């Protein structure tokens, strides 16, 4: 459990780590790079690098913090990967339910398994302190929103459009009804792919029209002006303005 520089959360909690590539957005996975670095450093728990690994010793970590905290769950993996047993996900949920003072953000690319877990396995029971999200990097992955929207009892349903690799338009604009929050950001790293300003403005405009909070995280390695430079130097402003809105909790 660690503090993080990710601006849309407060701490990361990794009761598991590791993943396998699933779609285009996975090509330059930051978590894979970090896991292999930790493996090379001999860090305990990362002996297998980025292979899917359960971390049962981490299950109770949130219980040690009394102050209400926002946790990004499995920042170094995907909780709904097929190699994570359902029984283990149950244990993660037990910890979440035992910590009602905290908020837990769960983000996945395995939208169908997440849907089946909450709708079928848990009979629609989603802990009130859980926010559920799916990653969408281009128009081909817009389909991931459908299973997410079908999880009716989620307090917050959100999209992480990072890295945004194309305009979210496939014959028609992405349908955002039923979505409570949208995060957007560009890719970082030496092999980062550019994010066009047009794509960002299109997504922001759709959010504005629906009254959905829009959180622009960063331009990444390629700036608003299309120039490649350090991601920090490229910043997180659009036309000089910061747009980092949060969902409204009923």
Give the positions of each predicted feature:
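Conserved AdoMet/S-adenosylmethionine-binding subsite of the radical SAM
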Residues: 54-215
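General N-terminal targeting signals
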Residues: 30, 46, 88-90, 149, ...
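N-terminal [4Fe-4S]-dependent radical SAM core
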Residues: 1-71, 248
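Homeobox/homeodomain signature
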Residues: 3, 9, 44, 49, ...
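Residue-level marker of positions within ordered structural domains that often coincide
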Residues: 24, 31-34, 78, 137, ...
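Auxiliary Fe-S-binding modules of radical SAM enzymes
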Residues: 1-17, 21, 38-41, 149, ...
């Amino acid at each position: 459990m660690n503090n993080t520089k990710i601006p849309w959360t407060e701490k990361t909690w990794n009761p598991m780590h590791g993943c396998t590539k699933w779609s285009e957005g996975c090509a330059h996975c930051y978590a894979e790079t970090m896991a292999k670095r930790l493996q090379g450093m001999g860090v305990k728990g990362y002996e297998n690098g980025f292979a899917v690994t359960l971390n049962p010793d981490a299950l109770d970590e949130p219980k040690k913090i009394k102050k209400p905290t926002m946790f990004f769950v499995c920042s170094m993996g995907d909780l709904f990967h097929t190699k994570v047993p359902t029984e283990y996900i149950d244990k993660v949920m037990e910890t979440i339910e035992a910590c009602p003072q905290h908020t837990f953000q769960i983000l996945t690319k395995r939208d169908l398994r997440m849907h089946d877990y909450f709708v079928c396995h848990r009979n629609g029971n989603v802990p009130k302190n859980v926010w559920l999200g799916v990653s969408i990097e281009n128009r081909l992955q817009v389909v991931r929103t459908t299973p997410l929207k079908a999880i009716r009892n989620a307090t917050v349903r959100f999209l992480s459009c990072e890295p945004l690799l194309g305009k979210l338009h496939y014959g028609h604009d992405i349908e955002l009804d039923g979505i409570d929050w949208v995060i957007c950001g560009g890719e970082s790293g030496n092999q980062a792919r550019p994010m066009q300003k047009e794509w960002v403005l299109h997504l922001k405009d759709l959010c504005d029209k629906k009254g959905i909070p829009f959180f622009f995280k960063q331009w990444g390695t390629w700036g608003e002006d299309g120039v490649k430079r350090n991601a920090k130097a490229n910043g997180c402003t659009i036309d000089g303005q910061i747009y980092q809105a949060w969902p409204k909790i009923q």
